[in-house]
Amino acid sequence: MASGFKKPSAASTGQKRKVAPKPELTEDQKQEVREAFDLFDVDGSGTIDAKELKVAMRALGFEPRKEEMKKMISEVDREGTGKISFNDFLAVMTQKMSEKDTKEEILKAFRLFDDDETGKISFKNLKRVANELGENLTDEELQEMIDEADRDGDGEVNEEEFLRIMKKTSLY
């Protein structure tokens, strides 16, 4: 039985929820996605099948893994028809393309830290960037930052570790 009691929303309880901006594609990117979709929609039905999804994604420069494909298909093909509409394909590709942009932005930041091009961020690299940014951090605080991100215990932060920590902290 439904009652008149309404669960308080995050807004009404004074809590702030972080809402990520909805990824958007440029008109050129949308056109590129449309062309890839149309290439595989040979019968002009407005749908492609699940197998063609992977090929269409490859045509756009993505190499989805098997588990990733299964997850995407289950998300867009809720009725289990094996057919994917252009709008569903566009939604998947918008997400994928924004993730790719994010990764590229994070790696750009990584290269700014890694000025000696060792492929790793050392304590010295981190200290230099902190000083350039005018951050007054102690050596202990800087070392804690390295230790937090350093998974393989080599005392430095490689690209993979940097990507992980940046995504974990939701800075990107």
UniProtKB/Swiss-Prot annotation:
Single GO MF annotation: calcium ion binding
Q: Which CDD domains match?
A: EFh
Q: List the residue ranges of the region (Disordered).
A: 1-31
Which Pfam families did the record assign?
EF-hand_7
Domain (EF-hand): give its ranges.
28-63, 64-99, 101-136, 137-172
Reading the lineage from the top rank, the first entry is Eukaryota
- Is Aminoacyl-tRNA synthetase tagged as a keyword? no
* GO CC aspect terms: centriole; centrosome; cytosol; nucleus; photoreceptor connecting cilium; spindle pole
> Where does the protein end up?
Cytoplasm, Cytoskeleton, Microtubule organizing center, Centrosome; Cell projection, Cilium
Q: Does the keyword Calcium apply?
A: yes
Q: Which residues form a coiled coil?
A: none
The UniProt keyword set, sorted, is: Calcium, Cell cycle, Cell division, Cell projection, Cytoplasm, Cytoskeleton, Metal-binding, Mitosis, Repeat
Complex formation: Monomer. Interacts with CIMAP3. Interacts with USP49.
- Role of this protein: Plays a fundamental role in microtubule-organizing center structure and function. Plays a role in sperm cilia formation.
Miscellaneous comment text of the record: Binds two moles of calcium per mole of protein.
Family the UniProt entry places it in: Belongs to the centrin family.
What is this protein's name? Centrin-1
Q: Which organism is it from?
A: Homo sapiens
